[in-house]
Each structure stands twice: as structure tokens, then as C-alpha cells.
Amino acid sequence: RSEKSEGCRFMVRVMDLEELEQDALKRNIPVMQKEGILFLISQLQDMKATSCLEIGSAIGYSAMMMVTHVEGLQVETIELNDERYQEAVKNITERNLQDKITIHHDDALSFDVSQLQHAPYDCLFIDAAKAQYQKFFEKYVPFVLEKGIIIVDNLDFHGMIFDIDHIKNRNTKQLVKKIKRFKDWIFNHEDYDVEYYQIGDGICVIKRKEKE
């Protein structure tokens, strides 16, 4: 009986999170595309992850999806935007997930890393300001376990990365160039192996190269 009620609770929570996702999309709040979040969850499940550091919480959707689907997972997440942070706290608390999700209201670039509560992590998930991907990576990769993974979302930026010359908006063009620079940098980095997946808006799974 308890397994059945657990299953019911799980389904209710998943449907509830889908409603949250739809509401966020209507309000133009950036949430990870469905196929992207399911891919992320499968990566965490495959490695039996127990800890994930997320850069960019938005309204808490991806963190809640992760802890709902990955048994025993703790997510620690950092959000800069005040409104989104407040909404994330509300969403997490309403669903009684505050024992599985730790959220910090701060700029991840200036965040005091001594405040991290669950380091080292099985996974670092970067889905925040795209122009800062390399800085986020360099700051937080030391807190990823030797066999851990780094997942970076949004690397195609709506396909624009393949057609930079035709972008009219100057700011958008600068942003896409920065994403491309990060992509080139990480793909050519001698310390990391990178697998690229055309899922959602382009996802990279990055692992440290095994030492010879």
C-alpha cells in the first residue's frame, strides 16, 4: 500500500511541476526545455548522484525536477535575481523540498564558496548568464568530484551560434560570440573530455580526462 501511495504522490508532484513549467513559459521565465531536464535527470540517475550544484535557479523548477526524480539527491543552487529567488523559495517550501534543496541568493561570480554546504559535488550544472559560462566553470569546477560531471545548457542559443554573421542585434551578437568562445575553449581544453548533445538548446557533458 505504501508503495502505491508513494507512486501517487510522485505522479501528483510531476504533474504539479509540469503546471509550474507551463506557467513559467507563459511569463517568459527561462526554464530548461523538457527534453533537456529529462536528459540531465538521466545523467544523474546513471551515476547515482547524491549531490548537484546548480548555477542559476530561476524559479526552482529544474532543482525540484532533479530531486523529485533522483533518489537521495541534494541540490544546492544559486540565484542572482531577487524576484526569481523569492519565487523559488516559495515553490520549494510549498512542496516541502527544502530538506533536499539549498538555495542561495547571490551572484555566483562573487559568491563566497566557503558557504557551499554539500561540496564536493557529483555534478555541476550551469544554466545562468551565458556570457559568464567560462568564469562559472573555472570558479566551481574545483568543487566537482574527480569522477563527477559538468553539464552546460543553452550552447546553441536558438541555433544562432551557427549563423553569427546574420544576427542583427549587436548585444545578441556579442552574447553568441561569448558562447562560441566558451564552446571553443572547452572543446580544445587538454584536461577535459566533452560530449555534445543536440538536445533542447544544446547540452555539453564535460568530464575530467583520466590521468594516464
For each of these PLM feature ranges, what is it?
Residues R1-I151, L155-E212:
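A short alpha-helical cap/connector motif
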